[in-house]
Amino acid sequence: MAESLHIVGAGMAGSEAAWQAAEMGVPVVLHEMRPKVGTFAHRTGQFAEMVCSNSFRSDDDERNAVGLLHWEMRAARGLIMEMAAAHRLPAGGALAVDRDPFAESVTGRLRAHPLISVVEEEVADLPSSGNWIVATGPLTSSALAESLRALTGAEALAFFDAIAPIVYAETIDMEVAWRQSRYDKGETEDERTAYINCPMNREQYEAFIDALLAAEKTEFHEGETAGYFDGCLPIEVMAERGRETLRHGPMKPVGLTNSHRPEEKAHAVVQLRRDNKLGTLYNIVGFQTKMKYGAQTAVFKMIPGLENASFARLGGIHRNTFLNSPTLLDDRMRLKLRPNIRFAGQVTGVEGYVESAAMGLLAGRMAAAEILGRDLPPPPPETAMGALVTHITGGAEAKSFQPMNVNFGLFPPIDARGGRRGRKDRYKAYTDRAKAAFTEWLGA
Protein backbone atom coordinates (compact mmCIF):
# COMPACT_ATOMS: atom_id res chain seq x y z
CA MET A 1 0.00 0.00 0.00
CA ALA A 2 1.12 3.57 -0.66
CA GLU A 3 2.52 5.78 2.07
CA SER A 4 -0.03 7.70 4.10
CA LEU A 5 -0.83 11.37 3.63
CA HIS A 6 -1.45 13.33 6.83
CA ILE A 7 -3.82 16.31 6.57
CA VAL A 8 -4.16 18.83 9.39
CA GLY A 9 -7.58 20.48 9.54
CA ALA A 10 -10.94 19.26 8.27
CA GLY A 11 -12.36 22.52 6.98
CA MET A 12 -13.20 23.14 3.34
CA ALA A 13 -9.61 22.67 2.13
CA GLY A 14 -8.65 19.74 4.34
CA SER A 15 -11.88 17.89 3.63
CA GLU A 16 -11.49 18.28 -0.13
CA ALA A 17 -7.79 17.37 -0.01
CA ALA A 18 -8.57 14.19 1.96
CA TRP A 19 -11.28 13.15 -0.48
CA GLN A 20 -9.17 13.74 -3.58
CA ALA A 21 -6.14 11.86 -2.24
CA ALA A 22 -8.21 8.92 -1.00
CA GLU A 23 -10.04 8.68 -4.32
CA MET A 24 -6.60 8.38 -5.98
CA GLY A 25 -5.85 5.39 -3.76
CA VAL A 26 -3.66 7.04 -1.13
CA PRO A 27 -4.37 6.32 2.57
CA VAL A 28 -5.21 9.52 4.45
CA VAL A 29 -4.92 10.37 8.14
CA LEU A 30 -7.13 13.41 8.77
CA HIS A 31 -6.22 15.33 11.94
CA GLU A 32 -8.94 17.61 13.36
CA MET A 33 -8.72 19.22 16.81
CA ARG A 34 -12.45 19.91 17.07
CA PRO A 35 -14.50 19.15 19.11
CA LYS A 36 -11.78 18.50 21.72
CA VAL A 37 -10.26 21.93 21.11
CA GLY A 38 -12.79 24.53 20.02
CA THR A 39 -12.51 27.93 18.35
CA PHE A 40 -14.37 31.20 18.70
CA ALA A 41 -16.17 30.78 15.38
CA HIS A 42 -17.03 27.07 15.20
CA ARG A 43 -20.13 25.63 16.86
CA THR A 44 -19.68 21.92 16.15
CA GLY A 45 -17.13 19.20 15.52
CA GLN A 46 -18.40 18.65 11.97
CA PHE A 47 -16.05 18.92 9.01
CA ALA A 48 -16.37 21.79 6.50
CA GLU A 49 -18.45 23.84 8.94
CA MET A 50 -19.51 27.16 7.40
CA VAL A 51 -18.77 29.74 10.09
CA CYS A 52 -19.56 32.94 8.20
CA SER A 53 -21.96 33.14 5.23
CA ASN A 54 -23.82 30.11 3.87
CA SER A 55 -23.17 31.19 0.28
CA PHE A 56 -20.66 29.92 -2.27
CA ARG A 57 -21.46 33.10 -4.25
CA SER A 58 -22.31 33.20 -7.97
CA ASP A 59 -22.96 29.92 -9.77
CA ASP A 60 -22.68 31.50 -13.24
CA ASP A 61 -19.91 29.49 -14.91
CA GLU A 62 -20.05 31.49 -18.16
CA ARG A 63 -19.42 35.06 -17.01
CA ASN A 64 -18.27 34.88 -13.38
CA ALA A 65 -14.87 33.75 -12.07
CA VAL A 66 -16.20 32.05 -8.93
CA GLY A 67 -18.90 30.32 -10.97
CA LEU A 68 -16.12 29.07 -13.24
CA LEU A 69 -14.33 27.74 -10.15
CA HIS A 70 -17.54 25.85 -9.27
CA TRP A 71 -17.49 24.31 -12.76
CA GLU A 72 -13.86 23.24 -12.46
CA MET A 73 -14.44 21.64 -9.05
CA ARG A 74 -17.46 19.75 -10.37
CA ALA A 75 -15.41 18.58 -13.36
CA ALA A 76 -12.77 17.30 -10.92
CA ARG A 77 -15.47 15.46 -8.93
CA GLY A 78 -15.00 17.63 -5.86
CA LEU A 79 -16.72 16.48 -2.68
CA ILE A 80 -17.52 20.01 -1.50
CA MET A 81 -19.42 20.89 -4.68
CA GLU A 82 -21.22 17.54 -4.70
CA MET A 83 -22.46 18.08 -1.14
CA ALA A 84 -23.32 21.72 -1.89
CA ALA A 85 -25.57 20.54 -4.72
CA ALA A 86 -27.25 18.03 -2.41
CA HIS A 87 -28.09 20.74 0.13
CA ARG A 88 -28.67 23.72 -2.16
CA LEU A 89 -31.06 26.48 -1.10
CA PRO A 90 -32.86 28.97 -3.39
CA ALA A 91 -30.63 32.05 -3.71
CA GLY A 92 -31.23 33.61 -7.12
CA GLY A 93 -28.07 33.23 -9.18
CA ALA A 94 -25.96 32.30 -6.15
CA LEU A 95 -25.15 28.88 -4.70
CA ALA A 96 -26.28 28.90 -1.07
CA VAL A 97 -26.45 25.78 1.10
CA ASP A 98 -28.17 24.51 4.23
CA ARG A 99 -25.05 24.71 6.37
CA ASP A 100 -25.65 22.03 9.05
CA PRO A 101 -26.81 19.17 6.78
CA PHE A 102 -24.04 20.13 4.36
CA ALA A 103 -21.34 19.78 7.03
CA GLU A 104 -22.89 16.56 8.35
CA SER A 105 -22.86 15.07 4.84
CA VAL A 106 -19.23 16.01 4.21
CA THR A 107 -18.29 14.52 7.59
CA GLY A 108 -20.24 11.34 6.91
CA ARG A 109 -18.68 10.78 3.48
CA LEU A 110 -15.14 11.28 4.77
CA ARG A 111 -15.57 9.09 7.86
CA ALA A 112 -17.09 6.34 5.72
CA HIS A 113 -14.27 6.28 3.16
CA PRO A 114 -12.20 3.09 3.58
CA LEU A 115 -8.89 4.92 3.00
CA ILE A 116 -9.54 7.81 5.42
CA SER A 117 -8.93 7.58 9.15
CA VAL A 118 -9.76 10.49 11.44
CA VAL A 119 -7.64 11.45 14.46
CA GLU A 120 -9.21 13.99 16.83
CA GLU A 121 -6.16 15.83 18.11
CA GLU A 122 -4.37 19.16 17.86
CA VAL A 123 -1.19 19.14 15.79
CA ALA A 124 1.14 21.65 17.44
CA ASP A 125 4.39 21.16 15.51
CA LEU A 126 5.32 21.03 11.85
CA PRO A 127 6.57 17.48 11.17
CA SER A 128 10.03 16.92 9.69
CA SER A 129 9.16 13.66 7.95
CA GLY A 130 6.21 12.04 6.20
CA ASN A 131 3.76 13.58 3.74
CA TRP A 132 1.67 16.42 5.14
CA ILE A 133 -0.87 19.01 4.08
CA VAL A 134 -1.57 21.82 6.54
CA ALA A 135 -5.09 23.16 5.98
CA THR A 136 -5.76 24.76 9.35
CA GLY A 137 -7.68 27.69 7.95
CA PRO A 138 -8.13 31.15 9.40
CA LEU A 139 -8.07 29.90 12.98
CA THR A 140 -4.69 28.16 12.98
CA SER A 141 -3.87 27.32 16.60
CA SER A 142 -1.37 29.50 18.43
CA ALA A 143 0.99 26.55 18.93
CA LEU A 144 1.09 25.65 15.24
CA ALA A 145 1.43 29.29 14.18
CA GLU A 146 4.38 29.64 16.55
CA SER A 147 5.94 26.47 15.10
CA LEU A 148 5.57 27.96 11.62
CA ARG A 149 7.19 31.23 12.69
CA ALA A 150 10.08 29.34 14.27
CA LEU A 151 10.64 27.32 11.09
CA THR A 152 10.34 30.08 8.50
CA GLY A 153 11.69 33.01 10.46
CA ALA A 154 8.74 34.95 9.08
CA GLU A 155 5.78 36.41 10.88
CA ALA A 156 2.47 34.89 9.86
CA LEU A 157 0.20 37.70 8.75
CA ALA A 158 -3.13 38.22 10.44
CA PHE A 159 -6.34 40.05 9.75
CA PHE A 160 -9.87 39.69 11.02
CA ASP A 161 -13.03 38.26 9.50
CA ALA A 162 -16.36 39.44 10.80
CA ILE A 163 -19.48 37.25 10.99
CA ALA A 164 -22.99 38.40 10.05
CA PRO A 165 -26.02 37.92 12.32
CA ILE A 166 -28.86 35.45 11.67
CA VAL A 167 -32.55 36.29 12.22
CA TYR A 168 -35.55 34.04 12.90
CA ALA A 169 -37.75 34.38 9.79
CA GLU A 170 -41.01 34.38 11.76
CA THR A 171 -39.95 37.60 13.51
CA ILE A 172 -39.51 39.59 10.27
CA ASP A 173 -42.41 41.96 9.51
CA MET A 174 -43.48 40.94 6.01
CA GLU A 175 -45.96 43.82 5.83
CA VAL A 176 -42.86 46.01 5.50
CA ALA A 177 -40.37 43.63 3.90
CA TRP A 178 -40.88 41.73 0.64
CA ARG A 179 -39.37 38.75 -1.17
CA GLN A 180 -37.36 39.34 -4.33
CA SER A 181 -33.94 38.47 -5.75
CA ARG A 182 -32.09 41.41 -7.27
CA TYR A 183 -33.21 41.94 -10.87
CA ASP A 184 -35.56 38.95 -10.35
CA LYS A 185 -32.67 36.59 -11.05
CA GLY A 186 -33.35 32.86 -11.01
CA GLU A 187 -35.05 30.23 -13.11
CA THR A 188 -37.68 29.24 -10.54
CA GLU A 189 -40.08 31.23 -8.38
CA ASP A 190 -38.14 30.11 -5.30
CA GLU A 191 -34.94 31.57 -6.74
CA ARG A 192 -36.61 34.79 -7.90
CA THR A 193 -37.96 35.33 -4.36
CA ALA A 194 -34.95 34.00 -2.47
CA TYR A 195 -34.16 37.21 -0.56
CA ILE A 196 -36.14 39.22 1.97
CA ASN A 197 -35.74 42.96 1.43
CA CYS A 198 -36.10 45.71 4.03
CA PRO A 199 -36.36 49.24 2.57
CA MET A 200 -35.05 52.48 4.07
CA ASN A 201 -35.84 56.06 3.14
CA ARG A 202 -33.14 58.74 3.38
CA GLU A 203 -33.97 59.72 6.97
CA GLN A 204 -33.94 56.11 8.16
CA TYR A 205 -30.65 55.47 6.38
CA GLU A 206 -28.97 58.53 7.88
CA ALA A 207 -30.14 57.60 11.38
CA PHE A 208 -28.89 54.05 10.84
CA ILE A 209 -25.44 55.30 9.78
CA ASP A 210 -25.28 57.56 12.85
CA ALA A 211 -26.11 54.61 15.10
CA LEU A 212 -23.52 52.39 13.41
CA LEU A 213 -20.80 54.97 13.89
CA ALA A 214 -21.72 55.59 17.53
CA ALA A 215 -22.15 51.92 18.54
CA GLU A 216 -19.77 50.32 21.01
CA LYS A 217 -17.29 48.02 19.25
CA THR A 218 -15.36 44.95 20.35
CA GLU A 219 -11.79 45.80 21.33
CA PHE A 220 -8.82 43.89 19.96
CA HIS A 221 -6.51 42.00 22.27
CA GLU A 222 -3.11 43.45 23.10
CA GLY A 223 -0.68 42.93 20.24
CA GLU A 224 -3.39 42.41 17.63
CA THR A 225 -3.72 44.82 14.75
CA ALA A 226 -7.05 45.72 13.20
CA GLY A 227 -6.50 44.66 9.61
CA TYR A 228 -9.40 43.39 7.52
CA PHE A 229 -9.90 41.57 4.26
CA ASP A 230 -11.83 43.95 2.00
CA GLY A 231 -14.35 41.25 1.06
CA CYS A 232 -15.39 40.80 4.69
CA LEU A 233 -15.30 44.31 6.16
CA PRO A 234 -17.49 45.00 9.19
CA ILE A 235 -20.36 47.26 8.20
CA GLU A 236 -19.32 49.89 10.73
CA VAL A 237 -15.85 50.02 9.14
CA MET A 238 -17.51 50.51 5.74
CA ALA A 239 -19.61 53.30 7.24
CA GLU A 240 -16.47 54.97 8.57
CA ARG A 241 -15.14 55.14 5.00
CA GLY A 242 -18.04 57.34 3.94
CA ARG A 243 -21.73 57.80 4.67
CA GLU A 244 -22.70 56.62 1.17
CA THR A 245 -20.45 53.54 1.15
CA LEU A 246 -23.10 51.11 2.42
CA ARG A 247 -25.81 52.18 -0.03
CA HIS A 248 -23.36 51.53 -2.86
CA GLY A 249 -22.39 48.20 -1.28
CA PRO A 250 -24.51 45.67 0.65
CA MET A 251 -27.41 48.14 1.01
CA LYS A 252 -27.65 49.18 -2.65
CA PRO A 253 -31.31 49.52 -3.72
CA VAL A 254 -30.88 48.75 -7.44
CA GLY A 255 -32.79 45.92 -9.12
CA LEU A 256 -35.45 45.79 -6.39
CA THR A 257 -39.09 46.94 -6.35
CA ASN A 258 -41.10 47.20 -3.14
CA SER A 259 -44.13 44.95 -3.72
CA HIS A 260 -46.10 46.83 -1.05
CA ARG A 261 -45.36 50.28 -2.49
CA PRO A 262 -44.06 49.84 -6.05
CA GLU A 263 -44.22 53.58 -6.71
CA GLU A 264 -41.72 54.35 -3.92
CA LYS A 265 -38.00 54.05 -4.64
CA ALA A 266 -36.01 53.04 -1.57
CA HIS A 267 -32.93 55.06 -0.63
CA ALA A 268 -31.26 51.85 0.61
CA VAL A 269 -32.26 48.20 1.03
CA VAL A 270 -31.09 45.61 3.56
CA GLN A 271 -31.22 42.07 2.16
CA LEU A 272 -31.60 38.82 4.10
CA ARG A 273 -30.77 35.45 2.55
CA ARG A 274 -32.20 32.08 3.55
CA ASP A 275 -29.79 30.26 5.88
CA ASN A 276 -31.43 26.83 6.13
CA LYS A 277 -33.63 24.55 4.03
CA LEU A 278 -36.65 25.02 6.28
CA GLY A 279 -36.54 28.76 5.64
CA THR A 280 -36.73 29.47 9.38
CA LEU A 281 -33.41 31.34 9.50
CA TYR A 282 -32.14 34.25 7.40
CA ASN A 283 -28.73 35.93 7.52
CA ILE A 284 -28.35 39.66 6.92
CA VAL A 285 -26.29 39.86 3.73
CA GLY A 286 -23.02 41.75 4.08
CA PHE A 287 -23.75 42.73 7.68
CA GLN A 288 -20.69 41.22 9.31
CA THR A 289 -19.88 43.28 12.38
CA LYS A 290 -17.68 43.73 15.42
CA MET A 291 -20.25 45.72 17.39
CA LYS A 292 -20.87 44.48 20.91
CA TYR A 293 -23.95 42.29 21.28
CA GLY A 294 -26.14 44.87 23.00
CA ALA A 295 -25.33 47.46 20.36
CA GLN A 296 -26.06 45.00 17.55
CA THR A 297 -29.55 44.28 18.80
CA ALA A 298 -30.36 47.98 19.14
CA VAL A 299 -28.88 49.03 15.80
CA PHE A 300 -30.27 46.16 13.71
CA LYS A 301 -33.76 46.66 15.11
CA MET A 302 -33.68 50.12 13.48
CA ILE A 303 -34.01 48.35 10.11
CA PRO A 304 -37.62 48.59 8.86
CA GLY A 305 -39.17 45.14 9.13
CA LEU A 306 -36.73 44.01 11.83
CA GLU A 307 -38.08 46.13 14.68
CA ASN A 308 -39.27 42.99 16.50
CA ALA A 309 -36.66 40.60 15.14
CA SER A 310 -35.18 37.81 17.25
CA PHE A 311 -31.62 36.76 16.53
CA ALA A 312 -30.49 33.14 16.33
CA ARG A 313 -26.89 34.36 16.21
CA LEU A 314 -25.32 37.77 16.57
CA GLY A 315 -22.26 38.88 14.63
CA GLY A 316 -18.66 38.71 15.78
CA ILE A 317 -15.04 38.75 14.67
CA HIS A 318 -12.39 36.09 14.41
CA ARG A 319 -8.71 36.19 13.62
CA ASN A 320 -7.47 34.96 10.26
CA THR A 321 -3.85 33.83 9.99
CA PHE A 322 -2.19 33.25 6.63
CA LEU A 323 1.23 32.72 5.09
CA ASN A 324 3.22 34.98 2.84
CA SER A 325 2.82 32.25 0.25
CA PRO A 326 4.71 33.90 -2.65
CA THR A 327 7.82 33.79 -0.45
CA LEU A 328 7.30 30.46 1.30
CA LEU A 329 5.60 28.08 -1.18
CA ASP A 330 6.67 26.56 -4.50
CA ASP A 331 4.31 26.02 -7.43
CA ARG A 332 3.36 22.57 -6.09
CA MET A 333 2.16 24.28 -2.88
CA ARG A 334 5.10 22.82 -0.92
CA LEU A 335 6.94 24.69 1.81
CA LYS A 336 10.30 25.52 0.22
CA LEU A 337 12.15 25.00 3.51
CA ARG A 338 10.51 21.62 4.11
CA PRO A 339 9.04 20.16 0.91
CA ASN A 340 7.35 17.26 2.68
CA ILE A 341 4.74 19.79 3.84
CA ARG A 342 2.13 21.38 1.62
CA PHE A 343 -0.34 24.09 2.59
CA ALA A 344 -3.90 24.53 1.37
CA GLY A 345 -6.93 26.73 1.95
CA GLN A 346 -7.21 30.11 3.61
CA VAL A 347 -3.88 29.73 5.39
CA THR A 348 -2.26 30.10 1.93
CA GLY A 349 -3.86 33.50 1.35
CA VAL A 350 -6.94 32.68 -0.67
CA GLU A 351 -10.25 34.01 0.61
CA GLY A 352 -13.60 32.27 0.42
CA TYR A 353 -15.07 28.83 0.91
CA VAL A 354 -14.79 27.80 -2.73
CA GLU A 355 -11.27 29.15 -3.17
CA SER A 356 -10.18 27.29 -0.03
CA ALA A 357 -11.74 24.03 -1.18
CA ALA A 358 -10.17 24.45 -4.63
CA MET A 359 -6.69 24.81 -3.13
CA GLY A 360 -7.41 21.72 -1.04
CA LEU A 361 -8.38 19.86 -4.19
CA LEU A 362 -5.09 20.77 -5.85
CA ALA A 363 -2.94 20.06 -2.79
CA GLY A 364 -4.61 16.69 -2.28
CA ARG A 365 -4.11 15.66 -5.89
CA MET A 366 -0.52 16.93 -6.02
CA ALA A 367 0.45 15.21 -2.76
CA ALA A 368 -1.21 11.94 -3.79
CA ALA A 369 0.49 12.01 -7.19
CA GLU A 370 3.88 12.55 -5.54
CA ILE A 371 3.31 9.62 -3.16
CA LEU A 372 2.40 7.47 -6.17
CA GLY A 373 5.64 8.45 -7.92
CA ARG A 374 4.21 11.01 -10.34
CA ASP A 375 4.55 14.76 -10.69
CA LEU A 376 1.32 16.69 -11.13
CA PRO A 377 1.84 20.27 -12.33
CA PRO A 378 -0.73 22.92 -11.42
CA PRO A 379 -3.53 23.66 -13.90
CA PRO A 380 -2.72 26.27 -16.55
CA PRO A 381 -3.01 29.90 -15.39
CA GLU A 382 -5.86 30.33 -17.89
CA THR A 383 -8.05 28.26 -15.54
CA ALA A 384 -9.61 29.54 -12.30
CA MET A 385 -7.67 27.08 -10.13
CA GLY A 386 -4.48 27.73 -12.06
CA ALA A 387 -4.89 31.50 -11.80
CA LEU A 388 -5.35 31.26 -8.03
CA VAL A 389 -2.43 28.94 -7.34
CA THR A 390 -0.18 30.96 -9.66
CA HIS A 391 -1.13 34.12 -7.78
CA ILE A 392 -0.41 32.77 -4.30
CA THR A 393 2.80 30.93 -5.22
CA GLY A 394 4.52 33.75 -7.05
CA GLY A 395 2.20 35.89 -9.12
CA ALA A 396 1.45 38.26 -6.24
CA GLU A 397 3.83 40.85 -4.83
CA ALA A 398 5.29 39.31 -1.67
CA LYS A 399 5.73 42.67 0.09
CA SER A 400 2.06 43.59 -0.24
CA PHE A 401 0.52 40.10 -0.28
CA GLN A 402 -3.05 40.02 1.02
CA PRO A 403 -5.80 37.37 0.83
CA MET A 404 -7.50 37.19 -2.56
CA ASN A 405 -10.77 35.93 -4.01
CA VAL A 406 -10.77 34.45 -7.50
CA ASN A 407 -11.39 37.11 -10.16
CA PHE A 408 -10.68 37.60 -13.85
CA GLY A 409 -7.91 40.06 -13.01
CA LEU A 410 -5.77 37.06 -12.01
CA PHE A 411 -6.11 35.47 -15.46
CA PRO A 412 -3.77 36.10 -18.41
CA PRO A 413 -5.39 38.82 -20.56
CA ILE A 414 -7.56 37.79 -23.46
CA ASP A 415 -7.94 39.66 -26.73
CA ALA A 416 -11.56 40.83 -26.85
CA ARG A 417 -13.40 44.06 -27.52
CA GLY A 418 -14.09 46.43 -24.62
CA GLY A 419 -17.26 48.27 -23.72
CA ARG A 420 -20.30 47.08 -21.78
CA ARG A 421 -21.39 44.52 -24.35
CA GLY A 422 -17.76 43.63 -24.93
CA ARG A 423 -17.14 42.98 -21.23
CA LYS A 424 -19.75 40.21 -21.15
CA ASP A 425 -18.26 38.71 -24.29
CA ARG A 426 -14.80 38.96 -22.77
CA TYR A 427 -15.86 37.12 -19.60
CA LYS A 428 -17.43 34.40 -21.74
CA ALA A 429 -14.17 34.15 -23.66
CA TYR A 430 -12.27 33.76 -20.38
CA THR A 431 -14.53 30.92 -19.23
CA ASP A 432 -14.55 29.15 -22.61
CA ARG A 433 -10.75 29.23 -22.69
CA ALA A 434 -10.54 28.07 -19.06
CA LYS A 435 -12.91 25.13 -19.53
CA ALA A 436 -10.94 23.84 -22.50
CA ALA A 437 -7.64 24.19 -20.64
CA PHE A 438 -8.97 22.58 -17.46
CA THR A 439 -10.48 19.66 -19.34
CA GLU A 440 -7.13 19.05 -21.03
CA TRP A 441 -5.31 19.24 -17.66
CA LEU A 442 -7.71 16.74 -16.10
CA GLY A 443 -7.12 14.30 -18.94
CA ALA A 444 -3.32 14.58 -18.94
Swiss-Prot record:
Binding site for FAD: 9-14
Reaction(s) this enzyme catalyzes, per UniProt: uridine(54) in tRNA + (6R)-5,10-methylene-5,6,7,8-tetrahydrofolate + NADH + H(+) = 5-methyluridine(54) in tRNA + (6S)-5,6,7,8-tetrahydrofolate + NAD(+); uridine(54) in tRNA + (6R)-5,10-methylene-5,6,7,8-tetrahydrofolate + NADPH + H(+) = 5-methyluridine(54) in tRNA + (6S)-5,6,7,8-tetrahydrofolate + NADP(+)
InterPro entries given in the database record: FAD/NAD-bd_sf, MnmG-rel, MnmG-rel_CS, MnmG_N, TrmFO
Entries under SUPFAM superfamilies matching the protein: FAD/NAD(P)-binding domain
Localization: Cytoplasm
One GO CC annotation: cytosol
Any Pfam family: GIDA
Molecular function per GO: flavin adenine dinucleotide binding; tRNA (uracil(54)-C5)-methyltransferase activity, 5,10-methylenetetrahydrofolate-dependent
Biological process, per Gene Ontology: tRNA methylation; tRNA wobble uridine modification
Protein origin, superkingdom: Bacteria
Family: Belongs to the MnmG family. TrmFO subfamily.
HAMAP family associated with the record: TrmFO
Protein name: Methylenetetrahydrofolate--tRNA-(uracil-5-)-methyltransferase TrmFO
GN (gene name): trmFO
